[in-house]
From Swiss-Prot:
GO terms for molecular function: magnesium ion binding; phosphoglucosamine mutase activity; phosphomannomutase activity. Gene3D superfamilies: Alpha-D-Glucose-1,6-Bisphosphate, subunit A, domain 3, Alpha-D-phosphohexomutase, C-terminal domain. Keywords: Isomerase, Magnesium, Metal-binding, Phosphoprotein. It comes from the Bacteria. The modification Phosphoserine is found at S102. Activated by phosphorylation. It is an enzyme of class 5 (isomerase). Signal peptide: none annotated. Pfam families: PGM_PMM_I, PGM_PMM_II, PGM_PMM_III, PGM_PMM_IV. NCBIfam families: glmM, PRK10887.1. GO terms for biological process: carbohydrate metabolic process; peptidoglycan biosynthetic process; UDP-N-acetylglucosamine biosynthetic process. This is Phosphoglucosamine mutase. The lineage of its organism: Bacteria, Pseudomonadati, Pseudomonadota, Gammaproteobacteria, Moraxellales.
């Protein structure tokens, strides 16, 4: 059995596999694999988390398992997922581990690994960990145990790294920025980065209590940020998700700037334009058309930052991302980093001396509707003939004018129904029709 999904191991806390007992076994299994593959007698792992209350329990269990396997652990505390990736490299660790369920509600949690290079752990090592989980847990001789220490300057190290990706001769002195931290991992470091670069920062949702992460805030709920930017007379707004690997922005008029807009800015407005951009099957057709006009290459990957990264490496490109706000700039960071992505947009604003809304003038997304159909149990929509017939009928209706995309979430029991086309009302009607078809078939199944 494989416990690893598209983004590590994820689920509801207290239910397998997100339990303290499993986390202990996982830490031990991962520790045994790392000891076999490490040139060091006692390899080092860095361990961080977001602000979920359950993260503290999982952290204790994981570090106990790792220590029992003879691995040293550096505890980083609550920090963005990309910070863990960076510090894995900066501290010369053999691996990094993040406890987070990203944009999911507080009752979910997850565990994912980074390699020593700060990238997602190779599938081969995940498979080795899976095999090790089938074995009995046994304790090393006391002299061979590892131990855990807390890294007290982890926040400062990451803040300085983020600032290093912003041109040293630029500053943000003339900008007022509203930052929505989603009560998540960037609640402290996020506002600090922009303040230290000179911006006047209004911080929102930066008081995590362990249960309020992503609750009606952050990149998945930007409505209050849009309102706050206008109320504060700010130049722009920035919203992270719970682990700060996603970012969306808001211009001074309260208009949403999503991942497609950000990719458009980085690909067409920056001084150093990339050779190509990787989007996903969810990327708006308007982005593809705009990049073609700008003579910038464009390819689509499957949904998920690991697939975007894979396509970037295959093409030798550095810029890619998703409409949800996962933005990769591989010349700056090894993984999607919300703070660094926002800094790259701010760099373009400063170098062009333009407001955020001016950078997207003339770029208009095709009407697109995404309906998330939450189910009691996951099903494969393409295994049901009646649904396939509905999908085919919709594709024929939009032929040459739009597209549909029906896919299963890799992290939760959700079917995502996306419809895109040149007629907004038609798109809305068709998306709801297909979502209702999925719901009705799920009840039958």
């Amino acid at each position: 059995m494989s416990y690893f999904g598209t983004d590590g191991i994820r689920g509801k806390f207290g239910q397998m596999p997100i339990t303290p007992e499993f986390a202990l076994k996982l830490g031990f299994a991962a520790g045994k694999v790392l000891k076999r593959t490490s040139p060091k007698n006692k390899p080092l792992v860095v361990l961080g988390k977001d602000t979920r209350l359950s993260g503290y329990i999982l952290e204790s269990a994981l570090q106990a398992g790792l220590n029992a396997a003879g691995v040293y652990v550096h505890l980083l505390g609550p920090l963005p997922t990309p910070a863990i990736a960076h510090l894995t490299r900066a501290l010369h660790a053999h691996a990094g581990i993040v406890i987070s369920a990203s944009h999911n509600p507080y009752f979910d949690n997850g565990i994912k690994f980074f390699s020593s290079e700060g990238k997602k752990l190779p599938d081969s090592l995940q498979e080795e960990i899976n095999k090790e989980l089938e074995k009995d847990l046994f304790i090393e001789d006391t002299a061979n145990l590892g131990k855990s220490v807390r890294v007290t300057d982890a926040n400062g190290r990451y803040i300085e790294f983020c600032k290093s990706t912003f041109p040293y001769h630029f500053d943000l002195n003339n900008l007022k920025i509203v930052v929505d931290c989603a009560h998540g991992a960037a609640y402290s470091v996020g506002p600090s980065v922009f303040r230290e670069l000179g911006a006047k920062v209004v911080a929102l949702y930066n008081e995590p209590d362990g249960l309020n992460i992503n609750e009606n805030c952050g990149s998945t709920h930007p409505e209050s940020l849009q309102k706050a930017v206008v109320e504060h007379g700010a130049d722009l707004g920035i919203a992270f998700d719970g682990d700060a690997d996603r970012v969306v922005m808001v211009d001074k008029f309260g208009n949403l700037i999503d991942g497609d807009h950000i990719l458009y800015i980085l690909a067409t407005q920056a001084k150093n334009k990339p050779a190509g951009v990787v989007g996903t099957v969810m990327s708006n057709m308007a982005l593809e058309v705009a990049l073609e006009k700008a003579n910038v290459g464009f390819v689509r990957a499957k949904v998920g930052d690991r697939y975007v990264l894979q396509a970037l490496e295959e093409n030798g490109w550095v810029t890619g991302g998703e409409p949800s706000g996962h933005i990769l700039t591989l010349d700056k960071s090894t993984t999607g980093d919300a703070i660094i992505a926002a800094l790259q947009v701010l760099t373009v604003m400063v170098e062009q001396n333009k407001a955020l809304h001016e950078l997207v003038n003339g770029f208009k997304l095709y009407p697109q509707v995404l309906v998330n159909v939450r189910l009691e149990q996951m099903l494969d929509p393409y295994s049901i003939p009646a649904l396939v017939a509905e999908f085919n009928k919709a594709e024929e209706q939009l032929k040459g004018r739009g597209r549909i995309l029906i896919r299963k979430s890799g992290t939760e029991p959700v079917i995502r129904v996306m419809v895109e086309g040149d007629n907004e009302q038609e798109v809305k009607t068709l998306a709801e029709h297909l979502a209702n078809a999925v719901r009705s078939q799920a009840q039958v199944a």
